[in-house]
Amino acid sequence: MAKVRELEEAFVQEQPSPQLPSEIAEECCAQLLGKGLLVYPEDSAYLLAETAAGARSSGEKGGDPGLQVGVKSEMQLNNGNFSSEEEDADTQESKTKAADPQLSQKKSITQMMKDKKKQTQLTLQWLEDNYIVCEGVCLPRCILYAHYLDFCRKEKLEPACAATFGKTIRQKFPLLTTRRLGTRGHSKYHYYGIGIKESSAYYHSVYSGKGLTRFSGSKLKNEGGFTRKYSLSSKTGTLLPEFPSAQHLVYQGCISKDKVDTLIMMYKTHCQCILDNAINGNFEEIQHFLLHFWQGMPDHLLPLLENPVIIDIFCVCDSILYKVLTDVLIPATMQEMPESLLADIRNFAKNWEQWVVSSLENLPEALIDKKIPILRRFVSSLKRQTSFLHLAQIARPALFDQHVVNAMVSDIEKVDLNSIGSQALLTISNSTDTESDIYSEHDSITVFQELKDLLKKNATVEAFIEWLDTVVEQRVIKMSKQNGRSLKKRAQDFLLKWSFFGARVMHNLTLNNASSFGSFHLIRMLLDEYILLAMETQFNNDKEQELQNLLDKYMKNSDASKAAFTASPSSCFLANRNKASSLASDTVKNESHVETSYVPLPSSQPGAIPPALHPFSTEDTDNMPLPGQIELSQSTGHLMTPPISPAIASRGSVINQGPMASRPPSVGTVLSAPTHCSTYAEPIYPTLSPANHDFYGTNSNYQTMFRTQSHPASSLYAHRAEHGRCMAWTEQQLSRDFFGGSCAGSPYNCRPPSSYGPSTHTQESHSMQVLNTGSFNFLSNAGAGSCQGSTLPSNSPNGYYGNNINYSEAHRLGSMVNQHVSVISSVRSLPPYSDIHDPLNILDDSSRKQNNSFYADTLSPVACRTTVVASNLQTQIPSSSSQCMYGTSNQYPVQDSLDSNAASNREMVSSLPPINTVFMGTAAGDT
């Protein structure tokens, strides 16, 4: 009690604030003593540490300098900026210094707060130097905290706890959020919206991996016990990275950027289809996509396939596709894979080269010669990784069996490694090769001794992989870099001695009748396979670096080429949806890229076309005057997509759900017509010959707006004025003689043979057929299925096979837009015949079919085009009526009544992609 009284008196005497009453001071002292926060040495000396309001260093006080500080203010305890680890450290430090009077005095609270503020500033600067705001990127929280601990260790700072560090991060990145990602039972918290800068030292450790292969460091992801078998469904929605842009390429010669951009976009869509089918397990359909793309290449794009720059860009795109396919098909976590999936991947790798070679027939040899080596490396890597995973799955149970491991250790202990190392083959040195003895027999003995130690430690497959990474890195890669020797030569020397030493070990096990011979043989096969995989990975990385250098040569901006080549595949769950509005023109391919399209006609025949269409000459297009409000087209070529493959015509995907959802009758199985329409002509699209295997034929001289024919035009229509494609036709009554014959009776001739040169423009003006490019309807579009002579207003419905489905013009994206969707995630069967060709159920109404002539005997010039029968029209169809289909009847209802059925008709046949389709970074509203 005397000691307590003495301390209380000292507290009152040393009170720094005279305004504070002594009663309050005594109460504070009692509280400090009661809470154990007042520490004093055994010699009863005491020195009060000041509070935050009037704190000053203990050295400034007039007391004994040997006395120690023993007060920890409650402000420090209640401050959230200090962690529990710091409190424990401070308490331990106080006790230690109090016990030893010779130690330096403890820092005051003010000094500690200054240090803490300085450390926070250093941490914020470190965050700025190594991390960046990146929308759509997730970073595991544990990895970020591990980086912080490494930073504190290097800077000799006391790290804060994870919660305090989280507050510091949000000071730098206030919009940062957290998400819990991962499979059930193995989910972890991730920071969403932050990524590691490429200039950071942590970038390669996270995104590139520290090891030599994709499986290096995978042991961290297998912690936690039970893991499910790998399934491709977990990769659903994976999108390809961006391909090189045509705008950044440096071309050689005169090449249209629009054509190059179209070709690259087509190829990316093709590659995305391959990726989607691989994820869905439809490996056999990939062959059909290859044939469809390469053999259906439009003629006007074929010359690009001979350009060296385009060929090299294709090689870069192939490398990107192969890396994504490898990441999707084979898990880097060494997760157990079903046997059926392994078999499918092996079969896919076996047939891939044959599929690609067969699809490239009759194409430039330079393209084939460049693509084959890249695909062979991909096939070799795919086979090697599947083989390694298969062996790892078999060896894992053996390594977990303690009895098997003990038997292997016991048997290998009986092998004399020194006698094997002293055999003649390993001691032979080639005098001409001074580097041949670098990997000596001593190294072989050391390596196998390390293997023996791993077995004794009950090492897992992941531990063996980590060990092999170290062996190959230290004894092959590092040595080749230091001595300047070829990596290939060094790898060959290592593999030779590794294989020989392993074979001699197995020889000794055989002679000793080792009971664990089978298990050890399995482990050796696993190690051999991984070493080969590590070597091949290094060689493939060198080849990819060559492709990167090649891309840098062709790209104007090296950063853009690096971003395109090193980008990782993204997921639909991480896609940046906020950029949809700005990227709408990039993700939807506009095949004309302009709002007007013209056809060049001879200047000597300007009067043969309607007055609303202005001919122009092709000789001097730069100085050509503009008639009226019409603008010149900037399109330099006929940019069309390849035709629909007959092999996928029955697939209900977004590729063939648009206005081209029919197959040519001459390829594959032709859709059977119903009995009441047995005389329906076979060619669905009459302008094609039966020999053509695509909708666009093989002529490179066709126009996207006007298609020249060798016969008189058979139909005229008023085009959509709001799109600005052409001026409206004058509303004049055209006689029957204007058409030159029946619109349904006269056959169409085939297009002339293909050629790369410009059109001769020798067709007569009356041999011009106007097509409705707003929608490629083959049966009843406004150009081919509307009544001759009838004038349709600009707001006339442009239905799908006769449907009066009205879509807002904002969603149609112009009359020359063909939307390309990269991800196909919906498959359905082909709709019934009646749903496609007769959605309005016209064929079932016998009253609409009348067996009369195509043209009425009256003077009315209106005759409706039909395939089988015609109607006797006594009255003219008003401009608000729909297009005719198969046959006509009385007047159609007005537009207002048709709009009421738009919703129901849209459900029957829709040209829009399904809702569950994942688009390339665009929202559904952009389609």
Swiss-Prot record:
Tell me the function of this protein.
Answer: Transcription factor required to direct islet cell differentiation during endocrine pancreas development. Specifically required for the differentiation of 4 of the 5 islet cell types and for the production of insulin. Not required for pancreatic PP (polypeptide-producing) cells differentiation. Acts downstream of NEUROG3 and regulates the transcription factors involved in beta-cell maturation and function, thereby restricting the expression of the beta-cell differentiation and specification genes, and thus the beta-cell fate choice.
> What is the protein name stated in its UniProt record?
DNA-binding protein RFX6
**Cellular localisation:** Nucleus
In the record, the note on similarity to other proteins reads: Belongs to the RFX family.
Give the UniProt record's GO annotations in the biological process aspect: glucose homeostasis; pancreatic A cell differentiation; pancreatic D cell differentiation; pancreatic epsilon cell differentiation; positive regulation of DNA-templated transcription; positive regulation of insulin secretion involved in cellular response to glucose stimulus; positive regulation of transcription by RNA polymerase II; regulation of insulin secretion
What keywords would UniProt list here?
A: Developmental protein, Diabetes mellitus, Differentiation, DNA-binding, Nucleus, Transcription, Transcription regulation
Q: Where is the stretch described as Disordered?
A: 1-21, 81-108
Q: What induces it?
A: By Neurog3.
Q: Name one GO cellular component term.
A: nucleus
Q: What is its main location?
A: nucleus
Name of the gene this protein is made from: Rfx6
Upon deletion of the gene, what happens?
A: Mice were born at the expected Mendelian ratio, but fail to feed normally, exhibit gross bowel distension due to small bowel obstruction and die within 2 days post partum. Some, but not all, of the animals also have reduced pancreas size. pancreata had almost no expression of the islet hormones genes, except for PP (polypeptide-producing).
Q: Name the tissues where it is expressed.
A: In the adult pancreas, expression is restricted to the islets where it could be detected in all endocrine lineages.
